[in-house]
């Protein structure tokens, strides 16, 4: 406030009485502001899961199929994960001694998060401990307010607003995986059998990090 009103030197030389009435009013207004950063930055975590399975068969053929979906909203807005998974298994009895089978597992997992800046300000746990309780995120017109005092001992003079940072940045990763297993069993009698198994696995991970020109991370 003193810097915005260009009265820092006046305060250093003459104290409170040297400030203008507008500056004193702006400072006094801070007494009515008590921002609860815990309530603003965090929320209750919530997760939901759905599964559907189908199985059956005959004396020679059996099958099992399942589909699952899981979604988790983290305790920070914009942080979460969702996952799709598919499982398929089947076996076939060729004759009295030979049985073959195949299994397939497919999974897609997407993680969303905030983009962490070099100073760690976008970390809500860290920021909630440094932010002043009298700082308001928005002005009376609904525009972002900026905190210029959050980071000391740096030449980074950009203002910071953690909600704007979330709006202008994103950190997303997607993992797609697929695996299959093929097996065969030769059963000669109750004591002797021969089994063979072959497996294949493929996994692909992609990541996208976005920080536009208005973000503190830039």
Give the role of each language-model region.
Residues 1-34, 44, 74-79, 85, ...:
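Surface-exposed loop/interface segments of Gram-negative outer-membrane beta-barrel transport/assembly proteins
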Residues 34-35, 60-67:
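Transmembrane beta-strand segments of Gram-negative outer membrane beta-barrel proteins
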Residues 40-45, 54-58:
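Outer-membrane beta-barrel initiation region
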Residues 47, 58-59, 95-97, 187-189:
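Outer-membrane beta-barrel channels and translocator barrels
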Residues 52-58, 86-92, 180-186:
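Residues on the lipid-exposed face of transmembrane beta-strands in outer-membrane beta-barrel proteins
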Residues 60-63, 97-100, 192-194:
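Repeated loop/turn-to-beta-strand initiation elements of outer-membrane beta-barrel proteins
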Residues 67-73:
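Transmembrane beta-strand segments that form the barrel wall of outer-membrane beta-barrel proteins
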């Amino acid at each position: 406030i003193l810097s915005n009103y260009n009265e820092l030197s006046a305060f250093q030389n003459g104290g409170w009485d040297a400030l203008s009435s507008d500056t004193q009013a702006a400072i006094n207004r801070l007494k009515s502001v008590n921002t609860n950063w815990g309530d603003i930055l965090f929320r209750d975590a919530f997760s939901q899961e759905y599964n559907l399975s189908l199985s059956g068969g005959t004396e020679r053929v059996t099958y099992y199929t399942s589909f699952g979906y899981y979604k988790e909203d983290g305790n920070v807005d914009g942080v979460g994960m969702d996952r799709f998974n598919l499982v398929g298994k089947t076996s076939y009895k060729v004759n009295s001694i030979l049985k073959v089978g195949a299994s397939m597992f497919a999974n897609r997992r997407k993680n969303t998060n905030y983009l962490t800046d070099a100073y760690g300000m976008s970390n809500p746990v860290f920021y909630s401990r440094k932010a002043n309780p009298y700082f308001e995120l928005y002005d009376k017109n609904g525009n972002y307010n900026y905190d210029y005092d959050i980071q000391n001992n740096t030449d980074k003079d950009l203002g910071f607003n953690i909600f704007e940072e979330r709006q202008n940045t994103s950190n997303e990763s997607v993992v797609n995986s697929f695996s299959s297993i093929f097996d065969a069993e030769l059963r000669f009698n109750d004591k002797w059998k021969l089994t063979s198994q072959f497996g294949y696995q493929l996994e692909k991970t992609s990541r996208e990090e976005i920080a536009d020109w208005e973000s503190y991370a830039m």
